[in-house]
UniProtKB/Swiss-Prot annotation:
Domain of life: Eukaryota
SUPFAM superfamilies named in the record: Nucleotidylyl transferase, P-loop containing nucleoside triphosphate hydrolases, PUA domain-like
Protein name, entry field: Sulfate adenylyltransferase
Record keywords: Allosteric enzyme, Amino-acid biosynthesis, ATP-binding, Cysteine biosynthesis, Cytoplasm, Methionine biosynthesis, Nucleotide-binding, Nucleotidyltransferase, Transferase
Organism whose genome encodes this protein: Cryptococcus neoformans var. neoformans serotype D (strain B-3501A) (Filobasidiella neoformans)
Marked site positions, Induces change in substrate recognition on ATP binding: 337
Region feature (Allosteric regulation domain): 402-581
Length: 581
């Protein structure tokens, strides 16, 4: 029998009464709207379907403060203490949002999906409060350190106020990917009941699974005479993780390796916080709501990596210890596990702590696996399954087949456009991949025709972000991208790089065409510098707007001293050193 929901009742808020649905939908049309962020969208979906039971909305200040300080909701209705809930679930807004939307206690506002404008729910505002972000970071993530991705998100993306209140569901967010693998808690519980699964061991993952993971989950199931729920996160995970499309195809390739009827694959639309011990307790609560009776917690569960001092944010077994601390209230049995290692002599996997001293073992680290994928080197059968490796190779081809972006930055007339065109011809001669040329002025007029010569600093930043998005998408598709905007600001170049690295896989190179201003003015046949000095053009970089020279360029060149062929050759040598050409 499936485990009881956290708090005793599954808070499935999804409306099933047609008349009520129509009434709420009609009301939503008359209300002001909050368009949700990707994280808020994930949170709302799990509020609506009961995955976050006993929550019925976004946390008010009383619950938020209690969760941050005590890992519990505030006590209600005579409770001695509230239910365990270790992560604050909040809806952030700005002062401008409050003013524009007329947000106030008792007011109602529609929550919309930014992807299709669909009204998902109506929130009744219980309170509006300003959180102490430093305390939230210290208490929840363990440190106010922006090396932690959730602290960086809190500091850089989360607005200054939180709005608390219960929600009334109109509909769940619509998904078009892997629909047969998406189950609400009620649906998954019904599925377990249909299969007569009395004990279910849930396995949380945000990474592809290989033989060690399969052996680990099978061992856990056998020891407890249970079945296995493979429950990977397909919402927001750690930046740089394998995309969920690739991961789900890899999970599907792995599933036939389980004995018939032992395991089930279902997807979880969770926005992870990478909060280590607190996150492990949160994951246990969520899996309990989905009907699991057991939950696997491993070494450094949901850890984000290193802090600013190069140390781990959490101890290796802090997560297991915190889940154990709350085991009586969680009512879901934790299955602790050590890392698994391969024994070549017996062709089997064993937990590291059970291997006799001196026994030969073999392992492939994540770094080594990425290297083998990048270079096309073999991946042994003892490490993974043929189908899983095939999926990973399709998504992560070897370096000569990967896309890349070269950003040439410099003043107008520095020669960057000439270098870009010459490099384009050279790469096209070599073949093997398409080559796209993104020149700053041409793209500016194409992407935003309203921007003329009088471009403001903020427009320059936005323009480069747009070019970065295009470059990232082309890079992801395997193209060679040469971008040559002025790109005068460091923050803009970093935003551009983030677009390429995040979307395109990290093959990004910066070339600073450092030809000085006096030379650029001397060869300015179009008269832009002359017009700027006469006041006819505003914010021309180098005249009345700053150019911030990059300090991290892969190549610095100057057309006074270097010829275009020499510069192109130097760029090609950089690409060759990375096995990209």
């Amino acid at each position: 029998m499936a485990n009881a929901p956290h708090g005793g009742v599954l808070k499935d808020l999804l409306v099933r009464d047609a008349a009520l649905h129509d009434s709420l939908l009609q009301e939503a049309r008359s209300l002001n709207d909050i368009f949700l962020t990707e994280r808020q969208l994930c949170d709302l979906e799990l509020i609506l379907n009961g995955g976050f039971s006993p929550l019925e909305g976004f946390m008010n200040e009383r619950d938020y403060t209690s969760v941050v300080e005590t890992l519990r909701l505030a006590p209600y209705n005579g409770q001695k203490h509230g239910d365990v809930f270790p992560i604050p679930i909040t809806l952030d807004v700005s002062q401008e949002d409050i003013n524009t939307l007329g947000l106030k206690q008792g007011g109602r506002v529609a929550l919309r999906d930014p992807r299709d404008d669909a009204a998902l729910a109506i929130l009744t505002v219980s309170d509006i409060y300003r959180p102490n972000k430093a305390i939230e970071a210290e208490k929840v993530m363990g440190a106010d350190d922006i090396a932690h991705p959730s602290v960086a998100y809190l500091r850089n993306n989360v607005k200054e106020f939180y709005v608390g209140g219960k929600v009334q569901a109109i509909q769940a967010p619509t998904h078009f990917d892997y629909v047969p693998l998406r189950f609400t808690p009620a649906e998954l519980r019904a599925h377990f009941h249909k299969l007569a699964w009395r004990k279910v061991v849930a396995f949380q993952t945000r990474n592809p699974m290989h033989r060690a993971h399969r052996e680990l989950t099978v061992r856990a199931a056998r020891q407890r005479r249970a079945n296995v729920l493979i429950h990977p996160v397909v919402g927001l995970t750690k930046p740089g993780d394998v995309d969920h499309y690739t991961r789900v195809r890899a999970y599907q390739a792995l599933m036939p390796s389980y004995p018939e009827g032992m395991a089930h694959l279902a997807l979880l639309p969770l926005a992870m916080r990478m909060a280590g011990p607190r996150e492990a307790v949160w994951h246990a609560v969520i899996r309990k709501n989905f009907g699991a009776t057991h939950f696997i917690v491993g070494r450094d569960h949901a850890g984000p990596g290193k802090n600013s001092q190069g140390q781990d944010f959490y101890g290796p077994y802090d997560a297991q210890e915190l889940v154990t601390q709350f085991k009586d209230e969680l009512q879901i049995e934790m299955v602790p596990f050590q890392a698994m290692t391969y024994l070549p002599g017996s062709d089997e996997y064993q937990p590291v702590d059970e291997v006799p001293k001196g026994t030969p073992t073999a392992d492939i680290s994540g770094t080594e696996l990425r290297k083998r994928l990048r270079t096309g080197a073999s991946i042994p059968d003892w490490f993974s399954y043929t189908g899983v490796v095939k999926v990973l190779r399709e998504s992560y081809p070897p370096r000569p087949q990967q896309g890349f972006t070269i950003l040439l930055t410099g003043l107008h007339n520095s020669g960057k456009d000439t270098i870009a065109r010459a490099l384009q011809v050279t790469l096209q001669q070599q073949g093997s991949r398409s080559v796209s040329l993104l020149l700053g002025e041409e793209l500016r007029s194409d992407l935003d025709p309203q921007i003329g010569r009088a471009i403001t600093p903020e427009q320059k930043h936005i323009n480069l972000e747009r070019i970065g998005f295009v470059a990232g998408e082309l890079t992801k598709a395997g193209a060679a991208v040469i971008a040559a905007p002025t790109a005068p600001y460091e923050r803009s170049r970093q935003a551009f790089k983030k677009q390429v690295v995040g979307s395109g896989g990290g093959n990004y190179f910066l070339v600073h065409v450092a030809t000085p201003l006096e030379w650029c003015e001397k060869v300015d046949r179009r008269g832009l510098y002359k017009a700027a000095r006469a006041g006819e053009i505003k914010n021309l970089t180098g005249v009345d707007d700053v150019y911030e020279a990059p300090e991290d360029a892969d190549l610095v060149c100057d057309l006074r001293n270097d010829t275009v062929p020499e510069i192109v050759h130097s760029i090609i040598m950089i690409l060759e050193s990375q096995n990209l050409v």
